């Protein structure tokens, strides 16, 4: 014997199914429509399922229109608002292009002509320059080793005589940065030590003339036992030596008789405020004037002799002997030996100038 399935006590065989008898359902239309896009809401009412940007406006199905879109009243078409360089052509949104812009491989790009290039990781690894437009430079213009903040630099060769003046012009001679001249300035303030600190003013000018150095030297003693020469009271006082010692870069060493802070490249009638770091081109040539070694031959060309005169008087001569690279504890050296044979009585030591030249290291 089989049993029949018993219906629920509240089962209602009349459409709509599943609703309690006390619900207010104004219509009893059977659900002969698809639920895709439709809904039974409110209960008993067939309505549309809406998702943005579809909406109901004034009982009409409408479209929510945001910025950049417009619904044309005449045609009822939805259009895009454009401003140049954007435009509509053949119902397509495009961009108006003019040189040097173009579209290549569906990408907006820049047409770079001669002298211009867009840096990629394959061409340079400089930080900040990848994917940027740069100016291609040849020899002497710019550098691939540093990023100069977008500026194009002109490289000036060291020791070549070229520099930039205050106006940014490239000049062969710059009076404010004359790197062709190393000197002590023309003033008479003491800068040298003979037997005590700052007892004399050594005036020395070295000017580079190609492979030679043109030099001019003079001396004024302002203090100490050499200020006034009196060989009657001090007959042994017949000479002294001033040494200029330089390191491998041509920088004056502290152990020199000349004060280091008084020696630099020329800046008008003074010296540059920043100490120089290299001046090998002004140094005596090590082949022409070799350092003394055991058994090495000493040549007469290693010495320059001359006469200077105390007080500018021809009857008061002093011999000046200049030698090159003869000192120890340095890479290069210039040595001045001052001596006299006459007996001077109460003569002030103030000399005339002496000009000489020597072969430069570079």
Curated annotation (Swiss-Prot):
GO BP term (any one): symbiont entry into host cell
Subcellular location: Virion; Host nucleus
Gene Ontology CC: one annotated term: host cell nucleus
Entries under InterPro entries matching the protein: Adeno_fibre, Adeno_fibre_knob, Adenovirus_pIV-like_att, Attachment_protein_shaft_sf
A Pfam family the protein falls into: Adeno_knob
The keyword tRNA processing appears for this protein: no
Superkingdom of the source species: Viruses
Induction info: Expressed in the late phase of the viral replicative cycle.
Record flagged with keyword Iron: no
Keywords: Capsid protein, Host nucleus, Host-virus interaction, Late protein, Viral attachment to host cell, Virion, Virus entry into host cell
Disulfide bridge partners, by residue number: none
Role played: Forms spikes that protrude from each vertex of the icosahedral capsid. Interacts with host sialic acid to provide virion initial attachment to target cell. Fiber proteins are shed during virus entry, when virus is still at the cell surface.
Note: All late proteins expressed from the major late promoter are produced by alternative splicing and alternative polyadenylation of the same gene giving rise to non-overlapping ORFs. A leader sequence is present in the N-terminus of all these mRNAs and is recognized by the viral shutoff protein to provide expression although conventional translation via ribosome scanning from the cap has been shut off in the host cell.
Family as reported in the entry's similarity comment: Belongs to the adenoviridae fiber family.
Protein name, UniProt field: Fiber protein
């Amino acid at each position: 014997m089989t049993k029949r399935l018993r219906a629920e006590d509240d089962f209602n065989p009349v459409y709509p199914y599943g609703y309690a008898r006390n619900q207010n359902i104004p219509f009893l239309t059977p659900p002969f429509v698809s639920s895709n896009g439709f809904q039974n809401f409110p209960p008993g009412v067939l309505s549309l399922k809406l998702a943005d940007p579809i909406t109901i406006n004034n009982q009409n199905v409408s479209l929510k229109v945001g910025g950049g879109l417009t619904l044309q009243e005449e045609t009822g078409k939805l259009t895009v608002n454009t401003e140049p360089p954007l435009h509509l052509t053949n119902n397509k949104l495009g961009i108006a292009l003019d040189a040097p812009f173009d579209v290549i491989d569906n990408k907006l790009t820049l047409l770079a002509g001669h002298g211009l290039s867009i840096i990629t990781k394959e061409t340079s690894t400089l930080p900040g320059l990848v994917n940027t437009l740069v100016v291609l430079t040849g020899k002497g213009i710019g550098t691939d080793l540093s990023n100069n903040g977008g500026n194009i630099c002109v490289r000036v060769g060291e020791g070549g005589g070229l520099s930039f003046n205050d106006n940014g012009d490239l000049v062969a001679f710059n009076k404010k940065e004359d790197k062709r001249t190393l000197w002590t300035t023309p003033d008479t303030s003491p800068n040298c030590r003979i037997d005590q600190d700052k007892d004399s003013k050594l005036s020395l000018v070295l000017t580079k003339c190609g492979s030679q150095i043109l030099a001019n030297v003079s001396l004024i003693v302002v203090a100490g036992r050499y200020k006034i020469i009196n060989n009657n009271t001090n007959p042994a006082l017949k000479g002294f030596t001033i040494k200029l010692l330089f390191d491998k870069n041509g920088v004056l060493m502290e152990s020199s008789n000349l004060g280091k802070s008084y020696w630099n490249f020329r800046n008008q009638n003074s010296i540059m405020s920043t100490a120089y770091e290299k001046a090998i081109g002004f140094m005596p040539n090590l082949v022409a004037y070799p350092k003394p070694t055991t058994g090495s031959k000493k040549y007469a060309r290693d010495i320059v002799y001359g006469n200077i005169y105390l007080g500018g008087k021809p009857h008061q001569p002093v011999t000046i002997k200049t030698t090159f690279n003869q000192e120890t504890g340095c890479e290069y050296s210039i040595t001045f030996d001052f001596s006299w044979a006459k007996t001077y009585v109460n003569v002030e030591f103030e000399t005339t100038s002496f000009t000489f030249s020597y072969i430069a290291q570079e």
